[in-house]
From Swiss-Prot:
The gene is glyA. Pathway: One-carbon metabolism; tetrahydrofolate interconversion; Amino-acid biosynthesis; glycine biosynthesis; glycine from L-serine: step 1/1. It is found in: Cytoplasm. It is an enzyme of class 2 (transferase). This is Serine hydroxymethyltransferase. CDD domains: SHMT. The modification N6-(pyridoxal phosphate)lysine is found at residue 229. The lineage of its organism: Bacteria, Pseudomonadati, Pseudomonadota, Gammaproteobacteria, Alteromonadales. GO terms for biological process: glycine biosynthetic process from serine; tetrahydrofolate interconversion.
Length: 417
């Protein structure tokens, strides 16, 4: 018999302790992984609701199970809010992740073996944009494009490659690029060769929703995103379009269900609905602008301290610190900073001589620290501490000093105040 007072602490202390330790880690560590963020208690409330019990294969009004009248309301709210947020005429909120959303786009628009133009992973792309170890690289003929010597996307080279190889689909979007992407230019190139333009905006969706980064939805045939990262919602995916093409919309829906998934996660879709509503609030725009301001402030200090930033700066939420030429790998930098309670991730940089498991760079992002309330002053102070460690990564005294400073700063800015 189920009772409301059942809890994990009494029943499964081993698991409970792991959860508590992770909660403490989040409170006592500064999170700088560009793809991570803190979601709101409202989103977590939705995800912990009894919606988790309901199977709802199909779409609102067209379910394969009974008892879906209320989950239909939930999913419709999420769909309509997503459309409003990004100026779309179509939204599918069922993908369990960004990668699931991306695989649905491939399935809807392509056949195995078709040619696809995607950003080189080593230049800032994503696994699902054609990496040989991913389904995208295994099933499709991937032609990569990259960045030029200045660290910016080379659109002339992109056009040359597109005309030469005539891909059926071009992919815009990134996981480690700090510039502004010219979506209109990419659509112009796609139209020249009769290709689909597919944009994966996962990293910058929150910035786009707030109007502080260009919106790809008016330019692309189809756009995908995660619902966490800068959007600060639950872990999941979404597919959007403003193509006014009902045939395309049907293909996308079929590629999600039954093509790639069965029952949707209704508790997560409820979390998405809450997050989209939060993103429509005026304070969300203030938050996203601060995300960019904090990233620019961090870049300023890195450059002052003599560190190279790929592309020389940032126009979004992230930066890539290039350690080529220094006696320090990305893996070592990641570990040293982690010892001081600063969480980053090692990341390959353009022309990286080291393997992806070692790398010559670290990727840093500001969504999570901004969510805690950091402004430019705290971001600059933090960057100074990071540089202190990178300057002397094998010095335990430096690491201990910075760790103490980090703990004090975290206490001033709790994740959930």
């Amino acid at each position: 018999m189920l009772k409301k007072d059942m809890n994990i602490a009494d029943y499964d202390p081993e698991l409970f302790n792991a959860i508590q330790n992770e909660t403490l880690r989040q409170e006592e560590h500064i999170e700088l992984i560009a793809s991570e963020n803190y979601t709101s208690p409202r989103v977590m409330e939705a995800q912990g609701s009894q919606l988790t019990n309901k199977y709802a294969e199909g779409y609102p009004g067209k379910r394969y199970y009974g008892g879906c009248e209320y989950v239909d309301v939930v999913e419709t709210l999420a769909i309509e809010r997503a459309k409003q947020l990004f100026g779309a005429t179509y939204a599918n909120v069922q993908p369990h992740s960004g990668s699931q959303a991306n695989s649905a786009v491939y399935m809807a628009l392509l056949k195995p073996g078709d040619t696809v133009l995607g950003m080189n992973l080593a230049h800032g792309g994503h696994l699902t944009h054609g990496s040989p170890v991913n389904f995208s690289g295994k099933l499709y003929n991937i032609i990569p494009y990259g960045i030029d010597e200045s660290g910016k996307i080379d659109y002339e080279e992109m056009e040359r490659i597109a005309i030469e190889h005539k891909p059926k689909m071009m992919i815009g979007g990134f996981s480690a690029y700090s510039g502004i992407v010219d979506w209109a230019k990419m659509r112009e190139i796609a139209d020249k060769i009769g290709a689909y333009l597919f944009v994966d905006m996962a990293h910058v969706a929150g910035l786009i929703a707030a109007g502080v980064y260009p919106n790809p939805v008016p330019h692309a045939h189809v756009v995908t995103s995660t619902t966490h990262k800068t959007l600060a919602g639950p872990r999941g995916g979404v597919i959007l379009s403003a193509a006014d093409d009902e045939d395309l919309y049907k293909k996308l829906n079929s590629a999600v269900f039954p093509g790639g998934q069965g029952g949707p996660l209704m508790h997560v879709i409820a979390g998405k609905a809450v997050a989209f509503k939060e993103a429509l609030e005026p304070e969300f725009k203030v938050y996203q602008q601060q995300v960019v301001n904090n990233a620019k402030a961090m870049v300023e200090v890195f450059l002052e301290r003599g560190y190279k930033i790929v592309s020389g700066g940032t126009s979004n939420h992230l930066m890539l610190v290039d350690l080529i030429g220094r006696d320090l790998t990305g893996k070592e930098a990641d570990a040293a900073l982690g010892s001081a309670n600063i969480t980053v991730n090692k990341n390959s940089v353009p022309n990286d001589p080291r393997s992806p498991f070692v790398t010559s760079g670290v990727r840093i992002g500001t969504p999570a620290i901004t969510r805690r309330g950091f402004k430019e002053a705290e971001s600059k102070e933090l960057t100074g501490w990071i540089c202190d460690i990178l300057d002397d990564a094998n010095n335990p005294a430096v690491i201990e000093r910075v760790k103490g400073q980090v703990l004090a700063l975290c206490a001033r800015f709790p994740v959930y105040g």
